Amino acid sequence: MTLQAQLEALRDNTLKEIAQVATLKELNQIRVETLGKKGPITEVLRGMKNLSPEERPVVGGFANEIRDLLTEAIEARKVVLENEALNAALKEESLDVTLPGKQMPQGTRHILTQVMEEIEDIFLGMGYQVVEGYEVESDHYNFERMNLPKDHPARDMQDTFYISDEMLIRTHTSPVQARTMEKHDFSKGALRMISPGKVFRRDTDDATHSHQFHQIEGLVVDKNVTMGDLKGTLEVMMKKMFGEDRKIRLRPSYFPFTEPSVEVDVSCFKCGGAGCNVCKHTGWIEILGAGMVHPDVLQMSGIDPTEYSGFAFGLGPDRVAMLRYGVNDIRNFYQNDLRFLNQFKVKE
């Protein structure tokens, strides 16, 4: 009998055995005896050394087809036998379906997720789009497109996790803005966007610093955008976040990607400006940085700064949550202690 004929006979006999087997143990025995290292298929393959070079690929391919066919048949029969065993077990059990089931604990959205969604909803209501981007970024988009060339001294302001000379874990969500600006079709209208997400810096973790935290950056680019537009937008946001009687003030500052740049303070929502430990008895809380988009940043995105202008801002939802809920240690947000997190549980 030729090797191919042996394989055909093995196939037919094994398929009959598989169809007739009644237990998983017997099925496994067939699998071991037929497909194992000492099984007949292996023996056939070993006998191929006596075949001519022309016959070997034909018989070898046929043997592999038989092995695949039998493997599929065994798996199909296994499913049938498992279902039969399950049905038999269920028939033997006495189950009172009226008994109450086990109450599964229900989770809820993390407090930082709640705060971020609240901020996103505010800006969605003002016509902004939410755009997310890569956490692993290129040096080009993270720094150079933000007016921070390789020799710029302001790079010392941020310690960065580098993956290679040109790739890093983003230090802010600004790269999302750069990528969006270069793709936006201004013939269809202004660009209004926020870019939420995780950012990473080489900070030593303590009560107020974390190597990983969240950031939401906003950007508007259009014709005739002014600092007044920026101030009005942030006033609306602060009133919705902290109360209608909130006021903001702008203080001159410096950021490489905006000119002019400002630090934005909000009147204390705890004491109403009278002075307390939250505002350090000043009546004001530093809340975010902002400014008018630097002309160089616009130009690098293919936008004519003589025709278009824009404003940008960035705030930390982690800090907003700490201020709003009186959390003194940022690490509490990330330690997964349910005793802490359940304080902020909301009904879904």
From Swiss-Prot:
Chemical reaction(s) catalysed: tRNA(Phe) + L-phenylalanine + ATP = L-phenylalanyl-tRNA(Phe) + AMP + diphosphate + H(+)
Family per UniProt?
Belongs to the class-II aminoacyl-tRNA synthetase family. Phe-tRNA synthetase alpha subunit type 1 subfamily.
Return the protein name: Phenylalanine--tRNA ligase alpha subunit
Q: Which GO terms describe its biological process?
A: phenylalanyl-tRNA aminoacylation
Species lineage, top-down?
Bacteria, Bacillati, Bacillota, Bacilli, Lactobacillales
Where does this protein come from, organism-wise?
Enterococcus faecalis (strain ATCC 700802 / V583)
Cofactor names from the entry are: Mg(2+)
Q: Which Enzyme Commission number(s) are on file for it?
A: 6.1.1.20
Q: What class of enzyme is it?
A: ligase
